[in-house]
Amino acid sequence: MSYPQGYLYQPSASLALYSCPAYSTTVISGPRTDELGRSPSGSAFSPYAGSTAFTASSAGFSSPLQYSGDPAAAFTSYVGSPYDHSAGMAGSLEYHPYAAPLGIYAYGDPAYRKNASRDATATLKAWLNEHRKNPYPTKGEKIMLAIITKMTLTQVSTWFANARRRLKKENKMTWTPRNRSEDEDDDENIDLEKNEEDDPSKLEENGNQDGDAGDQKRSPDGVDFVRLEGEVHLGKELDQTRNNSELNELDERNGHLSNSSSPPTPPLCPPDQSPQAQEDQNLHGHTHQSIQQLLHHSNQPHPLDLVNRNTSVQHGPVTNNATSVIHSPPASTSKPKLWSLAEIATSSDKVKERSNAAEVAGTTAAKSMVVSASSPSRSPSAQCHFPNNTVLSRPLYYSIPFYPGYTNYGTFSHLHSHHGPSSSVNSTYHFNGINQPVLNKAEGLAKECKHISQSQDDLNKGTPYEMKKGMSSI
């Protein structure tokens, strides 16, 4: 509302400022009272203390500007008409500066009073008496009442909420209460004049729909849901008992294995071995497993057990003097899962599919050297047989069909080396499509590799002693 700084005087008039008293911003902007033109200290604005700057020219100062009683009249020649606010200053102070842009909708106007007047309260009471059956004004009605009563929307909503609460305490309710507050209803349903709860026809329709839904729940296509729910609960209880029984069986099985392995185990090979058998044992570099390894394999499920869980593969004798030490465990009886009614209905089909898949896997495994022996570090010698042993089971890759097809690893075992005098009987035996010369050559290579590995082991055993000896000499 003040004049802009720095653009008040032209250069021709600036020469006369040396003889004029200094002007402050309060003097330039126009005094509101008579005291604004007077200097507070006297010496800052006029050469004499207590003198006024614009009432008369001071003695000893000649100024080309003629001062009058109106302070703003001296600047009329230099300031254009758009900047002349002398006529509008008085009117600008009459209204609140923040209420004008909002117009007639006084949203958040600080000029409005906090409490409602008597006229506003009378208007709101009249509307409430007319709508006693549904005292929930819509958004449009609230805006209209706020305009009439010169209140805000928040004040109108609060007044109606308090009025409904007061009538409810006085037991003067003539309407059906709502589950949600009217503010949420107004925000979500702005154009909703009538609520569904107030319309009896819609209430009847909703009741019919609820009744139909209940009938459908009782008998959909003639099936009783209560009976099915009871079966589901029974199935869950049976499932829990089945899980407990399986856990008990696992514990008993582990305890039986630990008890069977707790007494001192007899030597894997009989002491009265022939020199030929001992030489073969030295050739294949076999080391027997300890009790800890037996326990380790007994406690952990083996991959071969997982393959042969649902079926038992019939292993036939491969050679005359060698028998497979691997015998699959008996097939476990498949129990139907009671997770749901659909699982019960389809459990028989799943059992059939599972058994068929297991039979196919078993036949393919039998065709591709399932009965081949394990690695030298995991299998006993050819003279030691454990027909009922499930602990010394082979790794999974010895029984997978594709592995012998690539490497024929199973034919390199010591079980097919034909020890003793009966080796000449089976000299022309063909195993897995490989001739006997090929087998002999492969066995020779395997023996050479084992001799090399044994010599390396001996060297490795001797090196620590030599190192210690060399260090002591140093």
Curated annotation (Swiss-Prot):
Tissue and organ expression note: Early in gastrulation, expressed in cells beneath the blastopore lip. Subsequently expressed in the neural plate in overlapping patterns with other irx members, which all share an anterior border of expression. At the time of neural tube closure (stage 19) in regions of the midbrain, hindbrain, neural tube and optic vesicle, where expression continues during tailbud stages. In stage 34, expressed throughout the eye retina. Does not appear to be expressed in the developing heart or pronephros.
Listed GO biological process terms: brain development; cell development; dorsal/ventral pattern formation; embryonic cranial skeleton morphogenesis; gonad development; neuron differentiation; proximal/distal pattern formation; regulation of transcription by RNA polymerase II
GO molecular function: DNA-binding transcription factor activity, RNA polymerase II-specific; RNA polymerase II cis-regulatory region sequence-specific DNA binding
Keyword DNA-binding: yes
Listed CDD domains: homeodomain (cd00086)
PROSITE patterns documented for this protein: HOMEOBOX_1 (PS00027), HOMEOBOX_2 (PS50071)
Acidic residues bias spans: 182-199
DNA-binding region, residue range(s): 109-171
Subcellular localization, as worded in the UniProt entry: Nucleus
Comp. bias (Pro residues): 263-273
Any Pfam family hit: Homeobox_KN
One annotated Gene Ontology cellular component of this protein: cytoplasm
Residue ranges that the Swiss-Prot or TrEMBL entry lists as coiled coil: none
Region annotation (Disordered) ranges: 174-222, 252-294, 453-474
Induction per the UniProt record: By hoxb4 and hoxb5. Down-regulated by hoxb9.
SUPFAM superfamilies attached to this UniProt entry: Homeodomain-like
InterPro entries (UniProt xref): HD, Homeobox_CS, Homeodomain-like_sf, Iroquois_homeo, KN_HD
Transmembrane segments: none
Principal place of residence: nucleus
Keyword Transcription: yes
Record key words, sorted: Developmental protein, Differentiation, DNA-binding, Homeobox, Neurogenesis, Nucleus, Transcription, Transcription regulation
Family: Belongs to the TALE/IRO homeobox family.
Function (record text): Acts partially redundantly with other irx members in neural patterning. Required for formation of the posterior forebrain, midbrain, hindbrain, and to a lesser extent, spinal cord. Patterns the neuroectoderm in both the anterior/posterior and dorsal/ventral axes. Does not appear to play a role in pronephros kidney development. Involved in craniofacial and gonadal development. Modulates the migration of progenitor cell populations in branchial arches and gonads by repressing CXCL12.
Name the record gives this protein: Iroquois-class homeodomain protein irx-5
Gene: irx5
